[in-house]
């Protein structure tokens, strides 16, 4: 049972949402009085309540989604709120659907999407993972953060070959190392207001860190938004090489660290937008002719379920006609299918750009 003080805060938060007529978040759309009354006094075995789930969206009425999962159990206990939001965000993934098992497929079927090097500046594939047996950010204690960091850093330090590298803890990091990581665009900052309000940044920077290999093509963020963000990237358009590196890293790490997985939802993450495959495959790409015809660009992107963003990510402009283009779908399809869809879409965009 949630305690009286929590329920009081929840009631106030619900009133605030109800009164916010211009709020367009999925939280507002799906947290009906009926759902609210059903969930307000529930509590996970780790002590998380509905307040942990919705507080970021109550605080930030301009949220797109507005909810986070404080622990793995929250996805089941608070399913009457999570399920419709997941179905709405991950278009086509119905509440009766089951996410397929992990399948990287034939990684050799991925290619260099731009062998001439005229369009694609860089290619990146990332996935998120949570460690089994640990809650997500809002419920973690400082000692759990440190315990997880110790487990992860020792696992990463044992990687060999191309993945061999160095772990840099944020705690006690020297100014020189910090600057070097900023220059390489590797350093993550303390969370934005959405993550702050979700209590995702407690005990900062305890347990947080960055690992990268010697040639800076493989990167792991430890305890940023998710327990692990595993990233493979390089200049140019060789998606095959980037994806192969990612899959071999994930498979190596998984041998030593069990990940949080849900029968219906796939791999679990702090934010419900990343569930399922958790995979985001993206390129920074110059498409000057299509950039002048944004409608055509969006039309092709829509056909292949691609998301088009500005160069610096969400809500930014395309600097010098350079776009960040990635797969949109994360749920209800395999890792292989998600990356294949992105590859097909990018090849099509390049073909159209050449013909214009």
Curated annotation (Swiss-Prot):
CDD domains xrefs: arginine_kinase_like
Entry comment describing in which tissues the protein is expressed: Muscle (at protein level).
Phosphagen kinase N-terminal domain span: 9-91
Pfam families, sorted: ATP-gua_Ptrans, ATP-gua_PtransN
Residue intervals of the Phosphagen kinase C-terminal domain: 119-356
UniProt KW keywords: Allergen, ATP-binding, Kinase, Nucleotide-binding, Transferase
GO biological process: dTDP metabolic process; phosphocreatine biosynthetic process
Residues the entry annotates as binding L-arginine: 64-68, 225, 271, 314
Catalysed reactions, as listed in the record: L-arginine + ATP = N(omega)-phospho-L-arginine + ADP + H(+); dTDP + ATP = dTTP + ADP
A GO term, aspect molecular function: creatine kinase activity
Entry binding sites for ATP: 122-126, 185, 229, 280-284, 309-314
EC number(s) on file: 2.7.3.3
Disulfide bond entries: none
Keyword Nucleotide-binding in annotation: yes
Recorded GO CC terms: extracellular space
InterPro entries: ATP-guanido_PTrfase (IPR000749), ATP-guanido_PTrfase_AS (IPR022415), ATP-guanido_PTrfase_cat (IPR022414), ATP-guanido_PTrfase_N (IPR022413), ATP-guanido_PTrfase_N_sf (IPR036802), Gln_synth/guanido_kin_cat_dom (IPR014746)
UniProt entry tagged with the keyword ATP-binding: yes
Subunit record text: Monomer.
Biological function: Catalyzes the reversible transfer of high energy ATP gamma-phosphate group to L-arginine. Has nucleoside diphosphate kinase-like activity toward dTDP. Binds and phosphorylates dTDP using ATP as a phosphate donor. Does not phosphorylate dADP, dCDP, dGDP, dTMP or thymidine.
Family of this protein: Belongs to the ATP:guanido phosphotransferase family.
Record protein name field: Arginine kinase Lit v 2.0101
Organismal lineage: Eukaryota, Metazoa, Ecdysozoa, Arthropoda, Crustacea
